[in-house]
Regions:
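Non-catalytic accessory regions of SAM-dependent methyltransferases
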Residues: 1-42, 49
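A general structural signal for well-ordered alpha-helical segments in protein cores
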Residues: 7, 26-27, 57, 67-70, ...
Length: 134
């Protein structure tokens, strides 16, 4: 089966189960299974997929359909332009949280202009996305 056909099949399975962003998820999962970038997939749409990789892809599509977040399958979440390792033991960093980081940085900048000392404490908060981003 060709890469483009596998992506289409994954997209259709996700769509049938009312999962939004089905094309994006199908591409991300296939790139993850193959260990390549999403750009690679676009360039190699006509390449054949091995049976083993196809099975892994289908298993991951089923995990998504059964409610497992994409980030827990790929163990990755982008946050503030950085990639963070995530698994079931941590919360997935959310885009809304980026607003908190941006506001904190603005306030810290104002304090630094006044030569104030700044201390930020972030303990046991999961992936460390907030503290690392600050």
């Amino acid at each position: 089966m060709k890469i483009k056909e596998v992506i289409e099949e994954g997209k259709n399975a996700l769509s049938k189960n009312n999962i939004e962003d089905n094309v994006i998820i199908a591409r991300e999962l296939l790139a993850f299974v193959l260990g390549v970038t999403k750009q690679y997939l676009v360039i190699h749409l006509e390449d054949e997929l091995s049976a083993e990789d196809y099975i892994k892809f289908k298993e991951n599509i089923d995990k998504i359909i059964n409610g497992k977040p994409l980030q827990y399958i790929t163990n990755n979440q982008e946050f503030m332009g950085l990639n963070f390792f995530v698994n079931e033991n941590v919360l997935i960093p959310q885009p809304d949280t980026e607003i908190i980081v941006e506001e904190t940085l603005k306030r810290c900048e104002k304090l630094l202009l006044k030569n104030a000392k700044i201390k930020i404490l972030d303990l046991c908060t999961g992936s460390g996305a907030i503290a690392i981003s600050l």
